[in-house]
């Protein structure tokens, strides 16, 4: 790797608009396409500082700076369009988190890279609405937080309480939310409001290792640790009244529940297993990449297909997982308010994934092409009238759920036609880290973080308080900056803003 002085690096970066920078070819070796990243002035400073720090002599660190990672992805075989960094981008394994890239399915050299999906396959967000208002929940929020904490298993080693044996797991991996529906954990209409209807049809549990299944079996219906949470939120601001009403959000003060979780240790194992296989495939097929972490395989190779089938099974696991937590959340609310989930109108507004690779059709250079779209820390955001979004949202565009961090706001956005053209129908997924986990632990004290939430009037239940500072708002970029940048750039549109009143965390 060549270390160039910072000013030389800057020659390859060009600001093309208030919210978008271009990364020219040559910034990293063998780039097949250009890169770009979306930022506002504050986020831009973070991106460039990260690059500047990596140019210092003797700068050794964990991951490469995000800008470099975007450019390395642009050098992968078969990539089309541009390698795109969204405003919440931060460096990660192989691909930066907040990087999306699309590969031409008809190009025999095109690759699939597990680093472009991430270890927590189908980590995603689900939003439930209620007909309760802040005034109904405020007096009982502590009990409600406790009740959710008791109902939903949380934390690193948490085990599920949804009864599950090995055969059930096989079926759940293949069927996704259809399994949850059959077992009575979700309502039929929940599926309609899920990306992929909660089931990837190419899932093949036979492509998943025993070890992954062993890790996954006890964890179904659990929240996990890290940035995963269940939050009781209040609608704070409505930017697009008409679209919000189509989602069942009529006015400020309405209570919603957001669940953010993924495929737990199961997805992690699937990714780990695939990386081992792909290293072999790269040697055999002589695939060169700029970064070892970008291990990949030709989409049409046995390894590529096996990974996509196992990844789909992990995605199904995550949908079943969020569905099980939906069930537990509905139970907790119904018990608290002495009624039924139905009477509380606890419908799923939408469920989106932000770590996944999917086959989609997009326009490239004026022609429609079949692409494998990698989204890592990036959310699908299809425009109005797109055939893959549910009937209820045909006129609004697909809802996009953007989770904030503990104690900060979350947003619902909608997809736009411009996003379809510029970013393959993708937008941001959250706040994006500004400090690494290790730095957060060194710089922040968990007691201060919890006190601050208390002062904000947020009830909190945490399984592992020592991990709290990793997730403190100070560790992240400002989610409002991120969402506003996407809105201003036109790749998604702001619809609703929510603020938390209770947080349940791993």
Curated annotation (Swiss-Prot):
Q: Which InterPro entries match?
A: RtcB, RtcB-like_sf, RtcB_euk
Summarizing the function annotation, the protein's role is: Catalytic subunit of the tRNA-splicing ligase complex that acts by directly joining spliced tRNA halves to mature-sized tRNAs by incorporating the precursor-derived splice junction phosphate into the mature tRNA as a canonical 3',5'-phosphodiester. May act as an RNA ligase with broad substrate specificity, and may function toward other RNAs.
Active site annotation, chain numbering: 429
What cofactor requirement does the entry state?
Mn(2+)
Q: Which UniProt keywords apply?
A: GTP-binding, Ligase, Manganese, Metal-binding, Nucleotide-binding, tRNA processing
Q: State the similarity comment.
A: Belongs to the RtcB family.
- Alphabetically, which GO biological process terms does the record hold? positive regulation of tRNA processing; tRNA processing; tRNA splicing, via endonucleolytic cleavage and ligation
Enzyme Commission number(s) of this protein: 6.5.1.8
A further note on this protein reads: Ligation probably proceeds through 3 nucleotidyl transfer steps, with 2',3'-cyclic phosphate termini being hydrolyzed to 3'-P termini in a step that precedes 3'-P activation with GMP. In the first nucleotidyl transfer step, RTCB reacts with GTP to form a covalent RTCB-histidine-GMP intermediate with release of PPi; in the second step, the GMP moiety is transferred to the RNA 3'-P; in the third step, the 5'-OH from the opposite RNA strand attacks the activated 3'-P to form a 3',5'-phosphodiester bond and release GMP.
Q: What binding details are noted for the cofactor?
A: Binds 2 manganese ions per subunit.
The entry lists its GO molecular-function terms as: GTP binding; metal ion binding; RNA ligase (GTP) activity
Q: Which GO terms describe its cellular component?
A: nucleus; tRNA-splicing ligase complex
Residues at which Mn(2+) 2 binds: 123, 260, 354
- Species this chain originates from: Drosophila melanogaster (Fruit fly)
Q: Which reaction does it catalyse?
A: a 3'-end 3'-phospho-ribonucleotide-RNA + a 5'-end dephospho-ribonucleoside-RNA + GTP = a ribonucleotidyl-ribonucleotide-RNA + GMP + diphosphate; a 3'-end 2',3'-cyclophospho-ribonucleotide-RNA + a 5'-end dephospho-ribonucleoside-RNA + GTP + H2O = a ribonucleotidyl-ribonucleotide-RNA + GMP + diphosphate + H(+)
Residues involved in Mn(2+) 1 binding: 120, 123, 228
Name of the protein this chain belongs to: RNA-splicing ligase RtcB homolog
Q: Which gene encodes it?
A: RtcB
Offer one Pfam family short name for this entry. RtcB
């Amino acid at each position: 790797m060549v270390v160039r002085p910072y000013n030389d690096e800057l020659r390859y970066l060009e600001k093309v608009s208030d919210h978008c920078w271009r990364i020219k070819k040559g910034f990293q070796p063998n780039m097949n396409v250009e890169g770009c990243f979306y930022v506002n002035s504050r986020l831009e400073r973070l991106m460039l500082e990260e690059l500047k720090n990596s140019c210092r002599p003797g700068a050794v660190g964990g991951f490469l700076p995000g800008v470099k990672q975007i450019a390395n992805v642009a050098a992968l075989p078969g990539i089309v369009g541009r390698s795109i960094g969204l405003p919440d981008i931060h460096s990660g394994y192989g691909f930066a988190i907040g990087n999306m890239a699309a590969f031409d399915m008809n190009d025999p050299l095109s690759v699939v890279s597990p680093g472009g999906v991430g270890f927590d396959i189908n980590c995603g967000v689900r939003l439930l609405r209620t007909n309760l208002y802040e005034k109904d929940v405020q007096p009982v929020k502590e009990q409600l937080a406790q009740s959710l904490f008791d109902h939903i298993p949380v934390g690193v080693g948490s085990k599920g309480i949804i009864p599950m044996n090995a055969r059930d797991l096989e079926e759940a991996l293949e069927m996704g939310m259809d399994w949850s529906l059959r077992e009575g954990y979700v309502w039929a209409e929940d599926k309609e409001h899920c990306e992929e209807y909660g089931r990837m049809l190419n899932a093949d549990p036979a492509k998943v290792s025993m070890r992954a299944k062993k890790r996954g079996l006890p964890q179904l219906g659990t929240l996990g640790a890290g940035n995963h949470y269940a939050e009781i939120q209040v609608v704070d601001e409505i930017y697009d009244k008409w679209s919000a009403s189509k989602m069942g959000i009529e006015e400020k003060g309405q209570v919603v529940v957001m669940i953010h979780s993924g495929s737990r240790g199961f997805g992690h194992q699937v990714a780990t297993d695939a990386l081992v296989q792909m290293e072999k495939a790269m040697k055999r097929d002589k695939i060169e990449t700029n970064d070892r972490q970008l291990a990949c395989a030709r989409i049409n190779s046995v390894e590529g297909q096996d990974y996509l089938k196992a990844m789909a099974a992990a995605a199904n696991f995550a949908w079943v997982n969020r569905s099980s937590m939906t069930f537990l959340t509905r139970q907790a609310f119904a018990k608290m308010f002495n009624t039924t989930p139905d009477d509380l109108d606890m419908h799923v507004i939408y469920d989106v994934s932000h770590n996944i690779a999917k086959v989609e059709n997009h326009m490239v250079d004026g022609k429609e092409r079949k692409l494998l779209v990698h989204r890592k820390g990036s959310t699908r955001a299809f425009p109005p009238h797109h055939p893959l979004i549910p009937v209820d949202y045909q006129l609004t565009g697909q809802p996009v759920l953007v989770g904030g961090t503990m104690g900060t706001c979350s947003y619902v956005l909608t997809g736009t036609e411009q996003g379809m053209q510029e970013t393959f129908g993708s937008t941001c997924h959250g706040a994006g880290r500004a400090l690494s986990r290790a730095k957060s632990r060194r710089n922040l004290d968990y007691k201060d973080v919890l006190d601050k939430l208390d002062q904000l009037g947020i009830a909190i239940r945490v399984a592992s308080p020592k991990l709290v500072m990793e997730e403190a708002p100070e560790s992240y970029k400002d989610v409002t900056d991120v969402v506003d940048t996407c809105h201003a750039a036109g790749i998604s549109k702001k619809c609703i803003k929510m603020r938390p009143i209770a947080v349940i965390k791993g």
